[in-house]
Amino acid sequence: MDINTAKEALLKRSNAFQERYFTAYGQLVLRVNEETYISSRENLRLSKLTEKDFDLFDINTGDIGRIFSSRDDINAIVFICTEAAVRFSKENQVMRPALDDLAQIIGPDVTVCPDGTARTLLKALRNRRGCFIQGSGIIAVGDTIEEAIAGARILEKSAEAEIYSGKLNGLQYLDPTTAQELHKYYDGSYSKVNQKEKVDFISSGAEEFQLRNRIIDCGKDMSRSELVQGSWGNISLRLNPDTMLITPSGMDYFSIRTEDIVRMNIHDLKYGMQRKPSSEYRLHAALYRRYPECNAIIHTHSNGISAFAAAHAGFRISEPPMDQLIGDMHCSEYRTPGTDELCDSIMEAIEGSHACIIANHGAIFYGNDLDVTLAIANAVESRACNLLGFGQRAEEEEA
């Protein structure tokens, strides 16, 4: 990787901080090669970064250089300072996972470091992909900048859930064994799926080609709307009475190509020699089988709804037309992601509605049209944020 490619990657991925929920100040860092790394200057507003904000450093420079020199598995580092992260880090010494994506991508627990020295951070990052720095914010690391940014946003989301959980009678934490198993699964399986650079294109008609591209566009829109972090969440469309098209597992929404979308039979769940489908394919297929009017499904990991998910709480929707389109948001019982048991739990919770909250996880929405379903997911997320009283700060600052 050369410096221009690295700078382009950081600028491109800085659009993950769209300020729907919070304004993030901080630093994006990427290893260029064995001798250098590129970094934005400290404490800049990440959504406003420009080409002039980056500098090249020797790999041995500063605490960042010492982290890179000590850990060859770390190629990207993200520092973010937000109100929720600072507040949580001042009041706590450790974070327990109440969201399973935190357990998976970051670790079974998260340390609050007393300082930001390389020695302290390296200790906290042992077998972890992130931590808090007391009174300063978040550091997240990864093999790629996409993974590090996703980790930082998941830590921020979890800090928000901790702070606002008092309005929801507290959080329901994952037990330590479950959290450890989820992290082990991510390291051993999820993070390694669909690593093949390209797959062969499956012959399809014009309608299927169009639907595949609609899924891709929807994924990018979900990311821009901050309804998901990184590769989390999933999307599907009904192709015909017996077949669905679904997003692949573990792939960033901005890297998915037309041929990466997986065609699957909703009855026998066969998909042949394609990408591995989203781990929630059983749930999507079950919804298509049960509800003939279901033509589109979206699964999100958005901040507001995630706070309710972490508390095993639902909420009422009484405002028209949303009350008719969705119904109340009930919360399912917690079950391990990607299992038949999770599918059964969600199918029970979604009965009589077109959406539900998934305990310790996120939310699922279905409808007749993909664009309408995405609009509903955005509207319900805004409703969750309003009920909690957060997510308006960035808009107020711009006003």
Task: Indicate residue ranges for each PLM-predicted region.
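Glycine-rich flexible loops
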Residues: 1-399
